[in-house]
């Protein structure tokens, strides 16, 4: 079936697939696992968007784990979030461990609707499941002319040590922002740690090193060896800034914990419920503030100023956050998505189990 998958990708190599074919493939697996069709479609679209943007650990690489969670009943197949608190421009939801990408998309849409009426809209979700690549939501908001902020933490996992410590307290605690401009949006997608659990696990399994000393062993020695995270006692991910300036990442992690678990009222102070997420989604309509035109003028000036900044030696040109991802998004939309070589082999057993045709 691989040839069929490549019909929309002229001259695509054998390891590239049309994005729409991948979305349908992922949706089919989820539906056959019992997920409601509209939920499955949203989850599939977000995962493929992650790969389109180049976030290969947070795209279809997550699908085998999601299917495992569904099979175990720790990610629900059907249902709806409950609104447990609300005001004119803010709501708190209980996600009931429904698929995170679907919940996050619903939260983004609701936040944008609130922003259209109130200027800002904020949705906080407790007990969501994992929400995949945060930049995908930021892009969707920015494409609609909305500034979006998305924060996420997983209260059931701890792999990042506070600055000055060797024992873990946090997850990488990612944050994303989508900022519209008259050209491509600025897409910020970073975490409070130097690297992520997904990347370190992938490199460890492949017997490879990290690009830099982004983790520390249990004695507090910085290293590029992801294996220290799987040793006994385990090491930890270093906060953003590393051993020298990790107080910055530490502070950012605390902020994200406050904006997710703190505002949601459910987090690390409670018994762990398994892999999941506590989520903060905020939408801001520039028209409510200085006006959309003025916002665009300021952001366009900033884009031009950054692009026009003199590069330091060894740098060809200055780029903006998300610039590479947007270029990759367009290129892969046109020519096919290049999947990481571990993804399809990991999905093959699920195709067999669920009676789906492998691409």
PLM regions: where:
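Catalytic-core signal marking the mid-to-C-terminal active-site face
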Residues: 2-5, 9-25, 258, 269-359
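Phosphate/diphosphate-binding glycine-rich loops and adjacent basic-rich segments that engage nucleotide
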Residues: 158-230
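Glycine-rich phosphate/pyrophosphate-binding loops
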Residues: 146-159, 257-275
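Acidic, glycine/proline-rich low-complexity segments that act as flexible tails and inter-domain linkers
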Residues: 3-18, 24, 28-43, 48, ...
């Amino acid at each position: 079936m691989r040839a069929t998958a490549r019909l929309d990708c002229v001259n695509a190599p054998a390891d590239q697939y049309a994005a729409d074919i991948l979305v349908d493939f992922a949706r089919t697996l989820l539906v056959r696992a019992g997920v409601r069709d509209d939920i499955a479609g949203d989850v599939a679209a977000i995962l493929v968007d992650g790969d389109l943007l180049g976030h290969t650990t947070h795209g279809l690489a997550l699908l085998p784990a999601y299917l495992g969670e569904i099979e175990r009943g720790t990610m629900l197949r059907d249902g709806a979030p409950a609104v447990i608190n609300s005001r004119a421009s803010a709501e708190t939801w209980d996600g009931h461990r429904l698929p995170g990408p679907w919940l996050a998309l619903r939260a983004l849409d609701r936040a944008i609707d609130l922003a259209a009426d109130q200027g800002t809209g904020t949705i906080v979700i407790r007990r969501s499941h994992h929400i995949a690549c945060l930049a995908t939501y930021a892009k969707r908001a920015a494409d609609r002319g909305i500034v979006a902020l998305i924060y996420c933490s997983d209260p059931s996992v701890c792999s990042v040590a506070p600055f000055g410590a060797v024992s873990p307290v946090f997850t990488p605690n990612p944050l994303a922002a989508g900022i519209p401009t008259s050209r491509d949006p600025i897409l910020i997608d970073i975490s409070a740690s130097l690297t992520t659990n997904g990347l370190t696990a992938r490199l460890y399994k492949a017997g490879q090193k990290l690009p830099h000393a982004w983790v520390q062993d249990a004695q507090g020695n910085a290293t590029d060896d992801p294996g220290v995270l799987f040793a006994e006692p385990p090491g930890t991910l270093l906060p953003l800034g590393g051993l020298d300036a990790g107080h910055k990442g530490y502070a950012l992690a605390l902020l994200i914990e406050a904006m997710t678990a703190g505002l949601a009222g459910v987090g690390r102070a409670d018994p762990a419920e398994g892999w999941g997420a506590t989520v903060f989604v905020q939408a801001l309509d520039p028209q409510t503030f200085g006006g959309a035109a003025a916002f665009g003028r300021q952001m366009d000036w900033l884009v031009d100023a950054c692009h026009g900044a003199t590069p330091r030696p060894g740098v060809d040109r200055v780029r903006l956050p998300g610039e590479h991802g947007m270029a990759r998004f367009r290129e892969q939309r046109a020519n096919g998505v290049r999947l990481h070589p571990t993804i399809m082999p990991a999905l093959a057993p699920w195709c067999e189990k669920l009676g789906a045709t492998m691409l």
